[in-house]
Amino acid sequence: MFARLTSTLFALAAVSAVFAAPGATTEQCNGGEVQCCNSVQDANNLDSSVKKIITGLLHLDLKQITGQVGVTCTSVNVLGIGGGSSWYGFAFSYSYILASDWAIGVCSTQQKVCCTNNSFHGLIALGCTPINVSV
């Protein structure tokens, strides 16, 4: 019984430490949402595969798209929870939280951007502005 109580208290303390982590980010952007995108491309210089997605799947006019386009993006909101990842894993495995960049809103190999049109289920995001992360 004592061991179970100790384990439970340790797990709660560990989870609390993650939520209080100094690296945690609650970045927001004016009129948009912070995203982690696998790539960010200029609307005037899109890859042919991205053009096909925009015109073929999404039925958008390329001439109407300006600025930066995020490709394959996931949302990063408070501590990253509720984004494109399945956040329920943290309830079952503390180590999963520590190993997951999205748990603290970090884009490890992706570009962090602020995008104003994210209504394409992560396929693309429009109106993106890169967010520079200083270390």
UniProtKB/Swiss-Prot annotation:
InterPro entries xref list: Hydrophobin
CDD domains linked to this entry: hydrophobin_I
Range of residues in the leader sequence: 1-20
Disulfide bonds listed in the record: 29-114, 36-107, 37-73, 115-128
Alphabetized GO MF terms: structural constituent of cell wall
A GO cellular-component term linked to this record: fungal-type cell wall
Assembly with partners or alone: Self-assembles to form functional amyloid fibrils called rodlets. Self-assembly into fibrillar rodlets occurs spontaneously at hydrophobic:hydrophilic interfaces and the rodlets further associate laterally to form amphipathic monolayers.
Role summary: Aerial growth, conidiation, and dispersal of filamentous fungi in the environment rely upon a capability of their secreting small amphipathic proteins called hydrophobins (HPBs) with low sequence identity. Class I can self-assemble into an outermost layer of rodlet bundles on aerial cell surfaces, conferring cellular hydrophobicity that supports fungal growth, development and dispersal; whereas Class II form highly ordered films at water-air interfaces through intermolecular interactions but contribute nothing to the rodlet structure.
Protein name in the entry: Class I hydrophobin 2
Organism listed in the record: Coprinopsis cinerea (strain Okayama-7 / 130 / ATCC MYA-4618 / FGSC 9003)
Gene behind the chain: hyd2
